[in-house]
Amino acid sequence: MEPGFWHEKWYKQQIGFHQQDINPFLVQYWQRLALPAGAKVFVPLCGKSLDMCFLAEQGHQVIGCELNELAVQQFFSDNQLEMTQTVEGEHQHYQTEQVSLYQGDIFTLPKRITQDVTAFYDRAALIAWPEEMRTQYAKQLANLLPSGSLGLLVTLDYPQETLNGPPFAVSPNWIEAHLTDDFEIQVLACQDVLADNPRFVKKEVPWLNEAAYLLKRK
């Protein structure tokens, strides 16, 4: 996906990928990571996700990376958070007490930004990439994460030929084939969420599975 695709989506506010509620898998399984309250948590392609508020409420320091400037600004304005803005190389850095967002390309995010994180949360990043770019993203994510860091990964899977992504289908087989070199993987849950997603129902997608994985960086 070219950057212009996402910039246009945010400009037109065609952001169906933005969830109005905290992700149920995050609420249900985050405690499985057993992190200390002050742990730093990396959220790639974070948008203006309310999930970051949940993570902050657990006492974590949230570090997000988001391509689009409007998404970052809306996160702070929607949640009535005062922030400071500075420049970090080619990234804009927006910061409030517990949330620090870097606006720019995740592929050029300096590794020092994430060198102290103990965990990560990916709900909308891996599934945002078509297959030819997904492996590149997965390698960059692994590159940014310290060994031993834990993560909660949430994916969607469906017959890809029935719908043009994003979100793109990411199967358990893809996870096994492309993430095992860098991560230990444990499946936490998988359930059909088709009834909760009208866009997929309208396109007559026969099934839609949402899965949660616990990952550990090797």
Swiss-Prot record:
Question: What Gene3D superfamilies would the database entry show?
Answer: Vaccinia Virus protein VP39
> Which keywords describe this protein according to UniProt?
Cytoplasm, Methyltransferase, S-adenosyl-L-methionine, Transferase
Q: According to its UniProt record, which protein family does this protein belong to?
A: Belongs to the class I-like SAM-binding methyltransferase superfamily. TPMT family.
Q: Where in the cell is it found?
A: Cytoplasm
Question: What PROSITE patterns is this protein classified in?
Answer: SAM_MT_TPMT
Q: Which reaction does it catalyse?
A: S-adenosyl-L-methionine + a thiopurine = S-adenosyl-L-homocysteine + a thiopurine S-methylether
A single GO CC term for this protein reads: cytoplasm
Please give one Gene Ontology molecular function term for this protein.
thiopurine S-methyltransferase activity
The broad enzyme category this protein falls into is: transferase
Gene (UniProt)? tpm
The organism's lineage?
Bacteria, Pseudomonadati, Pseudomonadota, Gammaproteobacteria, Alteromonadales
Q: List the disulfide bonds.
A: none
Q: What is a biological process (GO) this protein takes part in? A: methylation
Q: Specify one Pfam family.
A: TPMT
**Protein name, as recorded:** Thiopurine S-methyltransferase
Task: Provide the residue positions that the database annotates as binding S-adenosyl-L-methionine.
Answer: W10, L45, E66, R123
Tell me the domain of life. Answer: Bacteria
Q: Which NCBIfam families match?
A: PRK13255.1, TMPT_Se_Te
Q: What is its EC number?
A: 2.1.1.67
